[in-house]
Amino acid sequence: GAGRIVAIEEREVMEEKQSYYILEMPGEVKVMIPTATAEEHGIRSVINKEEAQKVMSVLGQDETEMEKNWNKRYRENMDKMKSGNIYEIADVVRNLSFKQKEKGLSTGEKKMLYNAKQILVSELVFAENSTQNEVEELIDNKINSSYAMFRTDEGEIGKVASAGSIVNKFIPFNG
């Protein structure tokens, strides 16, 4: 998830002096990462507001084709998570959220969804300068509205057009 660099310090580890980023992570956890290998460890700048909107756009799309075999699907999603690409992580959140609504998830996929969502939330909190609760609600609303848009059966009487609003269809009575 997202953290904040609070300091850069020189430390001697195994008789070698190095510069370290001191990162403060959620839950007041501090992590030291050598500055020389920061990129290799996936350290990057937090996304900006424009990129945050692109993340929300990914959440608002229909799910992408997923492997039917849960083991292969799990590995594919794990690779997306490990990539550190925020858009790939948003893809995992959306796809697993849709699958959870339709068929439910295995214990492993539930945990993956939780972890992916936490990564998204932690990044969007910084990008949007919002609270965790606000961002969680934003993500949930976006997923619910996109699920309703792409998965609502056209044969239903009422259809959720967007989060919180219902559009009733006119059905003529031939009686």
What name fits each language-model region?
Residues 1-41:
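A positional/architectural concept
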Residues 42-155, 161, 175:
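Charge/polar-rich, low-complexity and marginally structured segments
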Residues 169-174:
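Short, intrinsically disordered C-terminal tails of secreted or membrane-associated proteins
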